[in-house]
């Protein structure tokens, strides 16, 4: 259901409708008790990603491509 990045440090989300729900679902599946959301990752040289609050590790789950501007 969720696509792992090649380094397995985060989930990627494809350019599909409902990417915001994907972020919510991916974070929930990863153990986050709070709602995940999209945020910009440009300062880190990465595409937009899903942020999962209050997780000790793997806090960022990625979006990419056309979705990046929507993740700001």
From Swiss-Prot:
Disulfide bonds join 13-38, 23-50, 27-52, 63-71. Keywords: Disulfide bond, Ion channel impairing toxin, Neurotoxin, Secreted, Toxin, Voltage-gated sodium channel impairing toxin. SUPFAM superfamilies: Scorpion toxin-like. Residues 1-72 form the LCN-type CS-alpha/beta domain. Transmembrane segments: none annotated. Expressed by the venom gland. PROSITE patterns: LCN_CSAB (PS51863). One of its GO terms (molecular function) is sodium channel inhibitor activity. GO terms for cellular component: extracellular space. It comes from the Eukaryota. It holds the Pfam family Toxin_3. Its main location: secreted. It is found in: Secreted. Belongs to the long (4 C-C) scorpion toxin superfamily. Sodium channel inhibitor family. Has the structural arrangement of an alpha-helix connected to antiparallel beta-sheets by disulfide bonds (CS-alpha/beta). Sodium channel (Nav) specific neurotoxin. This is Phaiodotoxin-3. The lineage of its organism: Eukaryota, Metazoa, Ecdysozoa, Arthropoda, Chelicerata. The gene is phtx3.
């Amino acid at each position: 259901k969720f696509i792992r990045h090649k380094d397995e440090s985060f989930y990627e989300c494809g350019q599909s409708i409902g990417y915001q729900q994907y972020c919510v679902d991916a974070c929930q599946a990863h153990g986050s008790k709070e709602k995940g959301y999209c945020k910009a990752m440009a300062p880190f040289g990465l595409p937009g990603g899903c942020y999962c609050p209050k997780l000790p590790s793997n806090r960022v789950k990625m979006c990419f491509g056309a979705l990046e501007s929507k993740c700001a």
